[in-house]
């Protein structure tokens, strides 16, 4: 299970390239490195399950958190491709796309609509692993919501609140 990351400070990242790079390195580059090594080990074993935590922030990147969102978009794409590459190898990759999770990373922030708790995310992961799912949205309602969000014209999307 690959579960680490940083939200970072969007305002700071817009003027401090080192901070922006730190967010992207943590949320994308470091995860790609670990996933590549892990996948190779598990391919040789011909068995295993990999759980990767992306985010709905990467499904359609928003102005409010585009540094974090772009890193998660990259991770989401990498994990999707890796999951396809592992197909038939005995190794399963499950991509988890949580929405706003009330926890340490979001401490001090107002919860977004359809927020979840770490225990709700954990329960969804267990259900996904038990069912053989390749994608898990937490909460589930976010899947159809983001299907629609991807269809919105950029002029409307740009004005969307957090």
Give, region by region, the residue ranges found by the protein language model:
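Active-site helix of classical SDR
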Residues: 35, 71
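Rossmann-fold scaffold of SDR-type NAD(P)-dependent oxidoreductases
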Residues: 1-5, 52, 94
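Active-site loop immediately N-terminal to the catalytic Tyr-X3-Lys motif
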Residues: 60-66
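C-terminal helical subdomain
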Residues: 95-96, 110-147
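Residue(s) in the substrate-gating loop at a strand-loop-helix junction
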Residues: 55
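Conserved mid-core segment of classical short-chain dehydrogenase/reductases
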Residues: 5-21, 64
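Alpha-helical segment proximal to the catalytic Tyr-Lys
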Residues: 40, 84-88
